[in-house]
Swiss-Prot record:
Example GO BP: thiamine diphosphate biosynthetic process
Protein name in UniProt: Thiazole synthase
Active-site positions on this chain: K95
Organism lineage string: Bacteria, Pseudomonadati, Pseudomonadota, Gammaproteobacteria, Enterobacterales
Function: Catalyzes the rearrangement of 1-deoxy-D-xylulose 5-phosphate (DXP) to produce the thiazole phosphate moiety of thiamine. Sulfur is provided by the thiocarboxylate moiety of the carrier protein ThiS. In vitro, sulfur can be provided by H(2)S.
């Protein structure tokens, strides 16, 4: 079980809604993933006419919708988008994204911290997308964020956990859930994140652009389940080769003495 703010999740796989060929395929893949939390950019929502073709299938699955502020370049823009999301979706949950860099979509740490503090004071449950910066994540926790979402590698890069050393520190030092977001390109990346100690991962591109998104969603679900089981069972601690003394798992001593 994973608890964030006032909600408990049985799935540690969060998903996105972008890049799918059709809304129907999106809904089928998300259902196959077992995800219970799905993020959607406010910039994709038609506030006048609604987005029933996108939102209705998600509601029918009973999935919690997490609007995000993707596209915001400043704290002011992000706060405005969050308020619109609260009105449009009747939710106080928000994924905070501020990335003025339109090429690499890297998060702005200063504006993110500023917006997070403002939104928490307004009663939002804030989940900020941020760089894998242990100091920043501590600051985000201190201002009241419900979780932190550090990147594994740049959005859409599918490069996996390029920031794993920093993620380890974040996981060790923070007492709120850590959700690895961005760069998860294969089920093995998601499994690694859970083995590191992350509480969940958010995956979009790797599922949406797969040749078979539904099958890929199932693969990610299996990877997340395996990662969680591995962590619960107690992983063997790696030993430096320079300090290692090999030990046979099936010694032959007693067998040979029998002869």
């Amino acid at each position: 079980m994973l608890k964030i703010a006032d909600t408990t999740f049985t799935s540690r796989l969060f998903t996105g809604t972008g890049k799918f060929a059709t809304p129907t395929l999106m809904a089928e893949a998300i259902k196959a993933s077992g995800s219970q939390l799905v993020t959607m950019a406010m910039k994709r929502v038609d506030l006048k006419n609604g987005n029933d073709d996108l939102i209705a299938p998600l509601k029918s699955l009973g999935i919690k919708l997490l609007p995000n502020t993707s596209g915001a370049k400043t704290a002011q823009e992000a706060v405005f988008a969050a308020r619109l999301a609260k009105e449009a979706f009747d939710t106080h949950w928000i994924k905070l994204e501020i990335h003025p860099d339109t090429k690499y979509l890297l998060p702005d740490p200063i504006e993110t911290l500023k917006a997070a503090e403002l939104l928490v004071k307004e009663g939002f449950v804030v989940l900020p997308y941020c760089s894998a910066d242990p100091v920043l994540c501590r600051r985000l926790e201190e201002v009241g964020c419900a979780a932190v979402m550090p990147l594994g590698s740049p959005i859409g890069s599918n490069q996996g956990l390029q920031t794993r050393d920093f993620l380890r520190i974040i996981i060790e030092q923070t007492s709120i859930p850590v959700v690895v977001d961005a760069g998860i390109g294969a089920p093995s990346h998601a499994l690694e994140a859970l083995e590191l100690g992350a509480d969940a991962v958010l995956v979009n591109t790797a599922i949406a652009v797969a040749k078979n998104p539904v099958l890929m969603a199932q693969a990610f679900k299996a990877a997340i389940d395996a990662g969680e089981l591995a962590r619960q069972s107690g992983l063997a601690v790696p030993t430096s080769i320079t300090h290692m003394q090999a030990q046979a798992s099936s010694p032959l001593t007693q067998y040979l003495e029998a002869f």
